[in-house]
């Protein structure tokens, strides 16, 4: 990299987390008969009923004491160890007329038919990590749908997988970051955590994490604080989080004109309430980059009588203000335990984001930009 007298950052931001269930500190619940259940709580806004009757694994981190040290160990069970069983229709005749699961009752995962007792959970985790149960001092463990991803359809045009939101954007952003060549400016790949629960953590988009990292990069390049602020003013962030494709059975849930389809191209999202960070300037810049890279784009806006969510760009800009655009891949069944997107959109995103990273943008305030 050859940094000039002045420089700027070109960033993508995605998030690594998805809605699921987190294991509570006291993890076991007795069930009917000899059964043992897992004591969990919801992480994020999931579609509850999609978690029924799927064998589930455990993944996360465990804090283990080794003498005078506390070490973090990653854990991902290689087999399914829990399931959330449905109540048979014979015992719930109205289930197909509208069923709202109670997370404290209906969504408790079954982990044993009688072989395990209260207190055995940590022993099982310790065995997975080859440590003693008393060495475990803390854990952040979550239920995981281990169902394999599938490319399917008569033309192999669909991809279905857990965690498509937002690992599709994390993957395509990372591939673009690794494959792009830009010798003059600072390319940054940022993947936040905890977006699904509000981003208000030390590793979330509302934290100082990104701003702190950019400031340290600025210092390592030999620039002063004034140069840092000038760099931010000339920088651009592409906030990457998936978008709702028009549902084949529920077109009425989308705006009549600003709706997007699978395999129709990368989505540029806008909202008058600024929950998406796109404005005319950032849209124009990203649109021009996509046009030059021969990548189709789609415009998304929420239906005017429906509230939409927010994502990363407007939140991270609270700590490190810069030009930003919200984009994503179109998908169906967002926040289901198994989601569906378009195969071609993955390729479109890699091509568009690679072109973004490789473009030496020269931003002159909010008035013009040299591509």
Functional labels for PLM-detected ranges:
Residues 4-371:
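N-terminal hydrophobic/helix-forming segments and targeting peptides
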């Amino acid at each position: 990299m050859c940094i000039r007298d002045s420089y700027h950052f070109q960033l993508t931001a995605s998030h690594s987390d998805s809605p699921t269930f987190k294991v509570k500190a006291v993890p076991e619940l007795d069930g009917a008969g000899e059964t043992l259940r897992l004591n969990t709580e919801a992480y994020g806004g999931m579609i509850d009923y999609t978690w029924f009757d799927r064998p589930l694994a455990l993944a996360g981190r465990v804090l283990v004491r080794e003498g005078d040290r506390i070490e973090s160990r990653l854990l991902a069970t290689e087999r399914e160890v829990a399931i959330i069983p449905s109540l048979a229709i014979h015992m719930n005749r109205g289930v197909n007329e509208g069923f709202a699961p109670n997370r404290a009752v209906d969504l408790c995962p079954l982990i044993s038919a009688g072989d395990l007792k209260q207190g055995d959970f940590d022993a099982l985790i310790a065995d997975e990590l080859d440590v003693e149960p008393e060495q475990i001092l803390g854990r952040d463990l979550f239920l995981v749908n281990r169902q394999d991803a599938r490319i399917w359809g008569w033309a192999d045009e669909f991809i279905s997988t857990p965690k498509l939101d937002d690992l599709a954007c994390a993957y395509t952003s990372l591939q673009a970051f690794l494959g792009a060549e830009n010798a003059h400016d600072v390319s940054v790949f940022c993947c936040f955590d905890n977006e699904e629960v509000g981003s208000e953590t030390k590793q979330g988009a509302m934290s100082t994490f990104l701003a702190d990292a950019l400031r340290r990069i600025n210092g390592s390049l030999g620039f002063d604080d004034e140069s840092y602020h000038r760099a931010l003013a000339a920088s651009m962030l592409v906030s990457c989080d998936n978008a709702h494709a028009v549902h084949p059975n529920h077109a009425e849930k989308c705006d009549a004109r600003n709706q997007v389809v699978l395999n129709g191209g990368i989505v540029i999202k806008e909202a008058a309430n600024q929950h998406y960070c796109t404005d005319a300037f950032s849209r124009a810049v990203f649109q021009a980059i996509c046009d030059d890279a021969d990548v189709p784009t789609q415009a998304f806006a929420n239906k005017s009588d429906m509230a939409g969510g927010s994502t990363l760009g407007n939140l991270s800009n609270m700590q490190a203000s810069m030009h930003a655009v919200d984009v994503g891949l179109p998908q169906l069944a967002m926040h289901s335990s198994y989601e569906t997107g378009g195969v071609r959109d993955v390729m479109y995103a890699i091509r568009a984001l690679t072109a973004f990273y490789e473009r030496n943008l020269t931003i002159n305030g909010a008035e013009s930009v040299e591509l």
